[in-house]
Structure formats: C-alpha cells, structure tokens
Amino acid sequence: MARPLAGVRVLDMGTFITGPATGVLLADLGAEVIKVEMPGTGDPFRAFKGDLYSPHYQTYNRNKKSIELNTKLPEDLAAFDELVSTADVFIQNFRPGVAERLGVGPERLRGLNPRLVYCGITGFGNDGPW
C-alpha cells in the first residue's frame, strides 16, 4: 500500500471526533501520529465504552502512538516541546483560549518550530460564542 505521508510527524491533541478524525486520516496515509493525552483521563472518548473498550476511541485513534503529558507541568511541557521541535503538523480542537492556557497555542509552538503546520479546528471559529 502506498504511504504518501511516510516521514511526516503529527502531534494530535484532538479529542472526541474532529481532531482525532483528522489525525487518523493522516495516519492511514502513512504519517507517524502521536496522540498526546492528559494523564489519568486521556481523550474523553475513552469513557464511551462498549463491553471492554471504547469502539469510538479505537476507530478514531487507530495507527497512532500515544503519550500522556500534562503541559501545565514544566517537565511535561519540556517533553512536549521536544516533540514539537521534530513535528511537521500539530492538531487541536479546543475551545478558544484553551490551547494558550495549556501552553500549546500557535504563537508559542511556531516559535519553537517555524515550519510547523498548526491545525486549530473549531466548531464556531475563534470568535464564536462557544
């Protein structure tokens, strides 16, 4: 099978559907996708369980690696920054302002890696009421 995105590294901090769906499409095309999740809770879709596991989580996060990092902690933010320095793409689908509070806003990440493609997916834009 052709893997046109082989060699592309993606950091995926998306939750539920829009962020993870973007990441899984890139993974299916050969990109190395690293899912970054909060320690202890992870992606909220993990809690949408069937019998033994969450089929929703499995569907949208196949072919990905996973790491737990709390970017509010200095040591975890430093580890995240190392990943950013080697990444080609960053995906998030937070509400407006959340990425900045977590230390993963576009200005900061592009300062670490100017060639980074920053994908901020919103349901209502950065200026919408939600």
Locations of regions flagged by a protein language model:
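N-terminal helix-loop segment corresponding to the beta1-alpha1 unit
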Residues: 1-130
